[in-house]
Structure formats: C-alpha cells, structure tokens
Amino acid sequence: MTRMLPGYFPSPPRGVWHLGPLPIRAYALLIILGIVAALVVGGRCWEARGGERDVTYDIALWAVPFGLVGGRLYHLATDWRTYFGQNGAGLGAALRIWDGGLGIWGAVALGCVGAWLGCRRHRIPLPAFGDALAPGIILAQAIGRLGNYFNQELYGRETTMPWGLEVFYRRDPAGYMDPHSLDGVSTGQLAFVVQPTFLYELIWNVLVFFALIYVDRWFTLGHGRLFATYVAAYCIGRFCVELLRDDAATHIAGIRINSFTSTFVFIGAVVYIILAPKGREEPENLCRAEYVAREIPEPESATERATVASTYATTTAVPVSADEEFAETN
C-alpha cells in the first residue's frame, strides 16, 4: 500500500543526511535549536526581572551538560530493556544520545543541579533564575518534539482520524526495512496510521509557553512559583498524551511509568506553589555582587565628608582687601 490517504499527513522521508562521512541528524539539530531558543527567551525574561542577561549564558554552561546527561540517564533507567535486556542494543547504543532518547524529567532534575552550581558561583537565587527560564524551557521542549517527528517515534495508537500520521517503512544502508530505522530512507510503503502524539504535546507546550509569558507579565510570581507552574502545566499535558501512546514503555501495574512520574511531579509542583513565598524577589538581589558594586558606589565616611567640606570652603573663600573693607563700611 503506497498511496497517500486523504486527510492524513506523512512522516518525513528521512531523519538524517550525510555530508561525506558526517551524519547530520534532524533530532540533534532541533535539540540545539531548542537550547538556543531557551537561552534567548530566558535571557530576556531574566533581564526583565532585573538580572544580567549574560548570566543566563554563563549558567547554561553548567545546566545544559547536566541536563543532557540527566535526560539520557532517565531514558536508560525507564527503558533499560532496550539497551541492557535480552538482545538489547548494548552500551554503545546507550551512549549515542544523538539517536534520540531523552527523558524530560531527568533533564530538568539534573539540569537544576547544574543551574544551582552556576547560580552559586554568581551569587544569585536559583528559584528566581528558574522562574525566568521556565518559558524558554517549555518552548525548547516544543521544538524538540519535532525531532521525534523526523525519527518516526513516540507516536500513539493506530487511528482513522483525519489528522492521523502516516508512518512509512524505511530502508537503512544495509538494506534492512523497518519503520523505526533512524538511518533509513522512506520506501513509500505505508506501515500504519497513528495518533500524532508528538504534535499534541508540541501544541500543548506552545500554549503553556504563551500562558507563562502572560502570567509572568501580569502577575508577581517569584521564588520559584512560575517554574513550578510550568512543571504542573506540563505534567497535565504529558499525562493526557501518555494515555494515547502505544509505543514500547516500562509499565507499573499496567500503567506507563511516565504517567506515574507526571502524577507525582504534578503533586509536588502544586504543593510548592502553595507553600513558596508570595511576591517576587527585589531586582537588586538578582545581580552578581561585583555588578552591584560597580553600579552602587560605596558611601563616604564621616571623616572623608569633613575633609571634602573643609577643602571646598578653603578653595572657594575670596580674600577681601583693606580698601574694599573700608568702602563697604562707608
């Protein structure tokens, strides 16, 4: 069956291109694009709160590597059979992060550890920094979901809905045909039509992004409460999407593990929103110590002020001659 069914939209013919021996993967490019978008948006939000935009990029040098490692570790922990189970892909495949497989929960958790280390170096509060970065993170997640589209992965159950996603068989360089081939090229042969769950989550993430921008502009959410709002909102969307997915996943009591994670993380985020301090941090508390020292001069001591005053009085006094004094008295 090779014809395009009316109303359905096709998956991309490939997810990787080659420049000589160098593979260019759409998934990796979109992850990089998402990181750049998160830094641009986060830098502007941080500056709007009173911080220095450059600090965002400095802390990213800590947060991004930690986040990538955390995302991969979460994926390996929750899908370990794919790599280390019977007939698993092995350690080499586990290290190939560019092939896909990042768990957002691990990325956020370990990314926060990296951000905490960066914030300590710059002497700024982590919760406030998280608030500024939250809109950028959810936007990066939306962009990253396009990588799943190119990889033909993380889709839902088969469907006859008019917006279904057509998944085609792909043939890899060795001649093996599989719809899940990351290095293959589409043969045009339709494998199945599925729910485009990547698209559902992408749309949800974009809506959350605009909602966070609106809330950040019109409400004084600080002390990590905007970041917790992002986490709670994402959990709602992710929980609903997990109900539609049908790809291989670890289950607990017949429920996908990401559904459990979404539930417990959502509860934790709501509790944090309730218990965290109200209001927002003062702008002067969001700057590095050396930046504040440059902008705000140290007050003069009493001795220095007295010295300046006496010097000013001495230099401005005008001597009066005897003739001028006599003229004034007459």
Curated annotation (Swiss-Prot):
Database matches in InterPro entries: Lgt (IPR001640)
EC number(s) recorded for this UniProt protein: 2.5.1.145
Enzyme class, broadest EC rank: transferase
GO biological process, one term: lipoprotein biosynthetic process
Major place of residence: membrane
Keywords, in A-Z order: Cell membrane, Membrane, Transferase, Transmembrane, Transmembrane helix
Listed name of the protein: Phosphatidylglycerol--prolipoprotein diacylglyceryl transferase
Native source species: Mycobacterium leprae (strain TN)
